[in-house]
């Protein structure tokens, strides 16, 4: 084992940093690449801000998940009494 220079910071000691850069691969070799990769990829620990979970929204295409109501004439929607009386007269005769 080589003697370490006491004036050198611990993160600059020889062998403290890997020779290759970290990547996004999650294979077994890359998970054990360095301590950071092990905690991030191997253990799945992230110390960043947590994203707020969003509510599930209805898709834009299906807003109500229901069939649209058939269009009715204005007189039937408002309950026009004259139209109903005429219909009753035709039914009676």
Swiss-Prot record:
Interaction with the host capping enzyme RNGTT: annotated segments: 49-86
Report residue spans for region: Core: 38-48
Q: Which residues carry this modification: Asymmetric dimethylarginine?
A: 52
PTM annotation: Asymmetrical arginine methylation by host PRMT6 seems to diminish the transactivation capacity of Tat and affects the interaction with host CCNT1. Acetylation by EP300, CREBBP, GCN5L2/GCN5 and PCAF regulates the transactivation activity of Tat. EP300-mediated acetylation of Lys-50 promotes dissociation of Tat from the TAR RNA through the competitive binding to PCAF's bromodomain. In addition, the non-acetylated Tat's N-terminus can also interact with PCAF. PCAF-mediated acetylation of Lys-28 enhances Tat's binding to CCNT1. Lys-50 is deacetylated by SIRT1.
Gene Ontology MF annotations: actinin binding; cyclin binding; metal ion binding; protein domain specific binding; protein serine/threonine phosphatase inhibitor activity; RNA-binding transcription regulator activity; trans-activation response element binding
Composition bias (Polar residues) maps to: 73-82
Where are the residues of the annotated region Interaction with human CREBBP? 1-24
Q: Where is the composition biased (Basic and acidic residues)?
A: 83-93
What segments bear the compositional bias annotation Basic residues? 48-58
Motif interval(s): Nuclear localization signal, RNA-binding (TAR), and protein transduction = 49-57
Q: Where in the cell is it found?
A: Host nucleus, Host nucleolus; Host cytoplasm; Secreted
Q: Does the keyword RNA-binding apply?
A: yes
Q: Name the residues that bind Zn(2+) 2.
A: 25, 27, 30
Region of interest called Transactivation, as start-end residue ranges on this chain: 1-48
What assembly does the database describe for this protein? Interacts with host CCNT1. Associates with the P-TEFb complex composed at least of Tat, P-TEFb (CDK9 and CCNT1), TAR RNA, RNA Pol II. Recruits the HATs CREBBP, TAF1/TFIID, EP300, PCAF and GCN5L2. Interacts with host KAT5/Tip60; this interaction targets the latter to degradation. Interacts with the host deacetylase SIRT1. Interacts with host capping enzyme RNGTT; this interaction stimulates RNGTT. Binds to host KDR, and to the host integrins ITGAV/ITGB3 and ITGA5/ITGB1. Interacts with host KPNB1/importin beta-1 without previous binding to KPNA1/importin alpha-1. Interacts with EIF2AK2.
Other information: HIV-1 lineages are divided in three main groups, M (for Major), O (for Outlier), and N (for New, or Non-M, Non-O). The vast majority of strains found worldwide belong to the group M. Group O seems to be endemic to and largely confined to Cameroon and neighboring countries in West Central Africa, where these viruses represent a small minority of HIV-1 strains. The group N is represented by a limited number of isolates from Cameroonian persons. The group M is further subdivided in 9 clades or subtypes (A to D, F to H, J and K).
Q: What is this protein called?
A: Protein Tat
